[in-house]
């Protein structure tokens, strides 16, 4: 469902009242954090800043049905294999970025029969946290997956953390790439869809 700017402002304000951080709201709405900040600080009466160029990506139709997540993950897995020159032995672990990359990571790892790990990004916690309940990344060759790449900061942060932990990051993979980037931190970036603002 398309939301007007006023509807987005109300939705952002509601999420803020519920205690979500700017980062969490951005993840929930698939918008950049700068857009969320603009929606919070610029009302109709106080529209001092120019509206940021952003595109809202809604993929609830996919996320609500596991069979659809599996179908898209099959495409993700094919892209991973293509990048690995069709040799899955070159890969140890799929890392999903919490929260929206988890479903895809789990399904891709299942299809490729490799480990799955979960990274929770956090601005104030030295780059985030790799969950100890899942696969680990030290000394492993990994692919990182998320839903939407808005600015690249979350992916860049995750790659940096994984490399510090001793992982060799082979590929960054997203459902939608909202940037012109083809690599992040020297890691190839592939998006199933790329958006371009004209």
Language-model features, listed with the residues they occupy:
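PRPP-associated nucleotide enzymes
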Residues: 1-145, 151-198
């Amino acid at each position: 469902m398309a939301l007007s700017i006023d509807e987005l402002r109300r939705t952002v304000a509601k999420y803020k009242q519920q205690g979500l951080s700017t980062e969490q709201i951005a993840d929930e709405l698939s918008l950049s954090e700068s857009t969320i900040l603009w929606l919070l600080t610029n009302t109709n009466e106080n529209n001092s800043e120019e509206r940021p160029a952003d595109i809202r990506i809604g993929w609830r139709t996919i996320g609500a049905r596991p069979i659809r997540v599996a179908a898209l993950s099959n495409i993700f897995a094919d892209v991973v294999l293509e990048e690995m020159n069709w040799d899955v032995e070159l890969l140890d672990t799929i890392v999903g970025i919490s929260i929206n990359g988890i479903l895809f990571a789990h399904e891709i790892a299942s299809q490729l029969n490799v480990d799955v790990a979960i990274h929770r990004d956090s601005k104030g916690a030295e780059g985030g946290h790799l969950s100890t309940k899942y696969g680990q990344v030290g000394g492993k060759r990994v692919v990182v997956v998320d839903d939407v790449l808005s600015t690249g900061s979350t992916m860049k942060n995750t790659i940096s953390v994984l490399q510090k932990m001793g992982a060799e990051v082979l590929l960054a993979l997203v459902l939608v790439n909202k940037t012109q980037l083809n690599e992040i931190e020297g890691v190839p970036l592939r998006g199933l869809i790329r958006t371009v603002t004209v």
